[in-house]
């Protein structure tokens, strides 16, 4: 069964030099903040790591969550911290994504 109003997103974060541990901490915090604010569903999260320490996060926005996140002070503060420690990269630019069967390592928190 699918939820036609929810949206699954895949985002890739490339850590800035020396900021790998900060990025890991932010990734631990990210989905709990979104859920606490009612912006993400309880779909089990998937967090992966690609070559170069790039973190790939898969989660599901609640209906309207994307739009509401852009007005939410807690989320905006979290995103500000993200931009200090990483660059977001396109999934298609990851070496793994160029393969027929993209393989990543699972990151457990």
Protein language model features and the residues they cover:
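Basic/polar N-terminal segments that are highly enriched at the extreme N-terminus
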Residues: 1-3, 109
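Active-site-flanking beta-strand signature of metal-NTP-handling nucleotidyl enzymes
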Residues: 6-14, 56-58
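Short, surface-exposed ligand-recognition loops at beta-strand->loop->(often short) alpha-helix junctions
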Residues: 14-26
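Short coil/turn motifs at secondary-structure junctions
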Residues: 16-18, 50, 62-64
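Short amphipathic alpha-helical/adjacent loop interface patches that line ligand
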Residues: 27, 31
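An amphipathic, aromatic/His-enriched active-site/gating alpha helix that lines ligand/cofactor pockets
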Residues: 32-44, 59-99
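A short beta-turn/loop motif at secondary-structure boundaries
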Residues: 46-52
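Short, low-order "capping/linker" segments at domain edges
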Residues: 96-109
């Amino acid at each position: 069964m699918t939820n036609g109003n929810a949206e699954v997103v895949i985002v890739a974060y490339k850590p800035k030099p020396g900021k790998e541990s900060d990025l890991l901490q932010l990734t631990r915090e990210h989905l709990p903040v979104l859920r606490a604010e009612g912006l993400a569903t309880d779909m089990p999260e998937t967090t992966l790591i690609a070559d170069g320490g790039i973190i790939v996060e898969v989660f599901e926005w609640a209906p309207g969550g994307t739009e509401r996140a852009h007005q939410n002070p807690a989320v905006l503060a979290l995103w500000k911290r993200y931009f200090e420690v990483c660059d977001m990269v396109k999934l298609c630019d990851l070496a793994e994504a160029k393969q027929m069967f993209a393989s990543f390592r699972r990151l457990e928190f």
